[in-house]
Regions:
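Serine residues within intrinsically disordered or low-complexity segments
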Residues: 3-6, 33
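Compositionally biased, low-complexity segments
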Residues: 1-2, 29
Length: 309
């Protein structure tokens, strides 16, 4: 049979036709062989047979994490650099002490990433961040002049901050993996943790050579109401894309953030360290690109296992 990834949209149909052809030949062989006193055992159903029989739901999209998945980066160094620069700007604008401003901003960012708000709070992460900065630091980030200052920093200053310490560059295998997904006719999106403004995320995309990748959706502070691993984050983005959880494969390196919590039906291909039990497939980004057929097969096998359990 041809490449699974190249015919993913018709995968089940192709497999059905192939199996029907082979089963017909085996039945004919069995009937003929009986005249010569020997028999051919009819094959047991394979995992892929079960996929078809169970009416498997077809994979439609692959969504990627960015940092340490598609982008090799010293993320802690980047966060520290960004945090110090933003704190310095807030200190100058608000005419407050640097230490106090850094402490307040740090608390806000911890609360944002930990999703410390009520379940009925539907503000975007950007709205939450802006309102908390105003409440705790006394600075209105939504003021046009102040907003423009931070936007300018993200787009015109931050791109030059990549140095030997941050060392951001494309992850080996990242572009080949994206090409494999595209060749398979699958939809593709960037599900990076939306704890940064759009400009800061696009900056890192530029460092990894991802700016021109035709992602259908890129998540950021302004279009998400929760951060990873909250299942709400994943489900609201899939709703925007018109997809259901069982139609999507997440690819990420973080054993906590890249697995929705609570589980919501999204499978994860894991490209980080360790061996999380929930992973559908494990390997490097280079492995993912080279063995994408195996990744797709693992997706369907996992789907069948869930159905049969």
């Amino acid at each position: 049979m041809g490449s699974i990834s190249s015919v993913n949209c018709d995968f089940l149909l192709v497999w059905r036709l192939f199996r029907n052809l082979m089963n017909t030949r085996l039945r004919n062989l069995t009937i003929t062989s009986q005249a010569f006193g020997f028999a051919v055992k009819y094959p047991e159903p394979t995992t892929l047979d079960q996929i078809y029989e169970k009416g498997a739901r077809v994979l439609k999209a692959v969504v990627f994490d960015m940092d340490e998945t598609l982008l090799s980066i010293n993320l802690n160094a980047f966060i520290l650099r960004y945090f110090k620069d933003v704190s310095s700007m807030l200190t100058d604008i608000g005419r407050r002490s640097r230490g106090g401003t850094m402490a307040r901003l740090g608390t806000i960012l911890v609360d944002l990433n930990a999703n410390r708000r009520s379940g009925t709070d539907n503000r975007t992460n950007l709205e939450f961040y802006q309102e908390e900065v105003e409440r705790r630091c006394g600075i209105c980030l939504s003021d046009p002049l102040i907003y423009e200052a931070f936007t300018y920093y993200d787009r015109e200053v931050l791109p030059y901050k990549n140095d030997d310490v941050i060392n951001a560059k494309a992850m080996p295998g990242a572009h080949a993996a994206l090409q494999a997904v595209q060749n398979a006719g699958l939809r593709c999106a960037l599900f990076t943790n939306p704890s940064f403004p759009q400009g800061a995320i696009e900056c890192r995309m530029g460092w990894g050579g991802l700016a021109d990748v035709p992602f259908e959706l890129v998540t950021h502070m302004g279009n998400a109401t929760r951060c990873k691993p909250d299942a709400t984050y994943y489900l609201e983005q899939l709703q925007v894309m018109g997809l259901k959880p069982h139609e999507v494969l997440m690819v990420g390196n973080d054993p906590k953030r890249d697995f929705p919590s609570p589980a919501c039906g999204i499978q994860t291909a894991y490209v980080g360290q360790g061996k999380p039990g929930r992973a559908t497939w494990r390997g490097t980004m280079e492995d993912f690109a080279r063995d994408f057929n195996a990744v797709i097969e693992a997706f369907y096998e996992h789907q069948v296992a869930d159905e049969l359990s």
